[in-house]
């Protein structure tokens, strides 16, 4: 099993290298998409995140958290799906992590030689956003690193979350980078090496790897350029620090603190040697400490399962929200 995890690590790590950051002059970009889709910024001051709101301002609340180096645009199809439902009003809160996809790094900036956390402070800020805006136990959906943030939010602020959906993420990525018995402490040297390599990699190497990685993360060719652009306009050191944090953080001991109904949807690892059965076993073992968790594999999809094709993902999302 752990051989499978170690092999999976190489596949997973290949999807995470990011392009060199490009300077931005505003709190976040993609404003042209906002104008087209009608969302507006939330009234919330933070140097870790900013939030876009779509849909019915009197509707039920759902928070969408994108993954590493991704923008809120990754959820546009999901937003369209939710807001088009007859008889169901949704107020959709999309998180944009500072330093990702054109947003200035601000509080997530990496200013020293040693990396500082990104995901954990973002989870705390989302909890503050929920509290200060009096959101009544919103549903939370997180993709990849966004799933990690969702787990942190639900475990560390259990009264804040009504239900949780994690998309293609396990609670301890570090298990994929070491032998049986790997712990957060024992994998720390590996995580530190990843930080150094990714934070200092030349732009050309990042661009080349990002292009190859997107081909494995998204099956639908027409959707790849958006993800590539998000990566290209992300702060390289923020992305590197966030990935290092994912490797070095073991959330398995915290899973029992989660009280919200939780579903984890995932796809088979993108390699013929990683069978659906091996993938299932990895997820079952990883989430064994979360009582009542529902695990669902989405077949014929890729890491960004909201794209490839989206109908299966929407079906699972609708089922989670209907419970």
Predicted regions and their residues:
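Bacterial N-terminal signal peptides
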Residues: 6-15
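Active-site loop/oxyanion-hole signature of alpha/beta-hydrolase fold enzymes
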Residues: 38, 44-48, 91-141, 145
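Flexible "cap/lid" loop of the alpha/beta hydrolase fold
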Residues: 164-200
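Conserved alpha/beta-hydrolase catalytic His-Asp/Glu region
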Residues: 175-182, 197-256
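Conserved loop-alpha-helix segment in the C-terminal half of the alpha/beta-hydrolase fold
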Residues: 261-301
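Catalytic histidine-centered segment of alpha/beta-hydrolase-like enzymes
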Residues: 301-310, 314
